[in-house]
Amino acid sequence: MSIDKKIKFFRKRRGMTQRELGTEVGFPPTSADVRIAQYENGSRTPKRYVLNVIADVLVVSPLALTVPEIEDDLVLLHTLFALEDHYGLKLSIDGATMYANLIISAKRDTPLYPKLYFWQVMRRRLATGEITKEEYDDWKYGLS
């Protein structure tokens, strides 16, 4: 999903209008909705510092707004290549189905381990109904 679509996705998820988001970001009330509309339709791209403010207002990590656009097959393929190179992604075929298996070997003393462990805890809490999908998404999109 591109930055423009992500801004719109998270704005709607928060139940905000373009004017409300733009005003909270700090744009003048007379043009706040226009500026956000320009970001959402892709005619303008927010500068890094503006993107950080938008993320703060939407209560998401700036990283959630800048994740690679994986809807494009080639972009996704190159992302998978990077996962293969850096983390050992393996492909397998079972009949007509292709599987991508990723086993990330994160030892307890590495910075990645607690992040992956807590992700697994949150997935389990979601599966058992201890938290809602919305709470899970709030946690996931808020990670920095």
Residue spans of the language-model regions?
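Conserved hydrophobic/aromatic packing and binding residues within compact polymer-binding modules
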Residues: 7, 18-22, 33-39, 54, ...
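Recognition helix of helix-turn-helix/homeodomain-like DNA-binding domains
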Residues: 26-46, 67-71
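Short, compact, well-ordered microdomains
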Residues: 128-139, 144
